Amino acid sequence: MDKKTARLRRAKRTRRNYIEQGTTRLVIHRTPRHIYAQVVTAEGTVLAAASTVEKAICETVKGTGNVAAAQAVGKAVAERAADKGIEKIAFDRSGFKYHGRVKALADAAREAGLQF
């Protein structure tokens, strides 16, 4: 089993648990160049989203595949979720290690008001 397959298996297992519990979750996806975040309901409806592909976020940071960009995305998605009245979520890291950009996004979202 290669690295990507193992990550996808971990993600599927944890995602199934979140859906069974009926929790709203903050889903992240990380590529070498960008990072994406979405607040998704248990039914699969996207309530808020942010990514380094967006022009507003891309222009505020130097580079899109670094910790500073992840912090900007975390803050933006938390503010957009707060506008919709969402405060408590589960953090779905999609099988990625809780380190580096993933941790930076989570910490920024917590500082901006999301609870998880």
From Swiss-Prot:
Pfam families assigned to the protein according to its UniProt record, in alphabetical order: Ribosomal_L18p (PF00861)
TM segment ranges: none
Keywords assigned by UniProt, alphabetized: Ribonucleoprotein, Ribosomal protein, RNA-binding, rRNA-binding
NADP among keywords: no
Superkingdom of the organism of origin: Bacteria
Gene3D superfamilies: 3.30.420.100
Biological processes per GO annotation: translation
One GO MF term: structural constituent of ribosome
GO CC term (a single one): cytosolic large ribosomal subunit
Function of the protein: This is one of the proteins that bind and probably mediate the attachment of the 5S RNA into the large ribosomal subunit, where it forms part of the central protuberance.
HAMAP family: Ribosomal_uL18_B
Family: Belongs to the universal ribosomal protein uL18 family.
Subunit and interaction comment: Part of the 50S ribosomal subunit; part of the 5S rRNA/L5/L18/L25 subcomplex. Contacts the 5S and 23S rRNAs.
PANTHER family, A to Z: 39S RIBOSOMAL PROTEIN L18, MITOCHONDRIAL (PTHR12899), LARGE RIBOSOMAL SUBUNIT PROTEIN UL18M (PTHR12899:SF3)
NCBIfam families reported in the protein's UniProt record: L18_bact
Protein name: Large ribosomal subunit protein uL18
Organism: Pseudoalteromonas translucida (strain TAC 125)
Gene it is expressed from: rplR
